[in-house]
Amino acid sequence: AKAVKEQLADFSDAEELRIRAELVVAVLANKLKETKQELSAKLINYFERDATWMDDPDMLRIIGNSTRVIDFNFLATLMNKLLVKYQKIDQYPLDTQKRIGNIFVNYLHVLYDYRAKRMARKYINFLQNLPGIPELTLDKLMGDYYDAVFFKNEKGLAQTLSVLKRVVPKIVSGLPEK
């Protein structure tokens, strides 16, 4: 990943790729904490300059992968913009629906880390109201999971975790409450 990052430095129009490479290198080298502030500044700068980021699948992927890196307050602004844009998510292609669902699942994890319960409800509702198709079932389940976690529904948490443990046990190991 470091070699790719260095090769990308030669391209003036590859800023999005450079940011993604830096993010990958930081994660693989287990240096996310050390580079968080610098990466966050680069991401903020990029999003502020690029008005089309909400329509760009690569930028949406970067947002989904960097929710724990971006400054919390700036991230809240980005998430609110996405929530407004994608209110009628069923009108978008399936890939976009999945990507936005994944972004909001990652964001709910950040909200949990920050104990930002008041901010969580609208993202939980979004996930729970995704179209009822198999490809979005996991995101809907994660909405149920975070609903139970944030709003202390022990029975709902036990039921949702039971399903998640059978379907995606590796994901359960990374969840905040098991």
Task: Tell where the protein language model's regions lie, with residue ranges.
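Charged, helix-prone or intrinsically disordered regulatory segments positioned adjacent to compact structured domains
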Residues: 1-44
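Helix-turn-helix repeat elements of alpha-solenoid scaffolds
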Residues: 1-4, 32-42, 72-84, 114-125
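Solenoid-like repeat scaffolds
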Residues: 5-15, 44-56, 81-97, 125-137, ...
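Generic helix N-cap/helix-start motif at coil->alpha-helix transitions
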Residues: 13-23, 54-62, 98-105, 136-142
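Conserved small-residue packing positions in alpha-helical repeats and bundles
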Residues: 19-31, 63-68, 104-111, 141-148
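Residue-level detector of the short coil/turn that links helix A to helix B
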Residues: 70, 112-115, 152-155
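Intrinsically disordered, low-complexity segments enriched in Gly and acidic/Ser/Thr residues
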Residues: 104-143
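C-terminal non-catalytic interaction modules
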Residues: 149-178
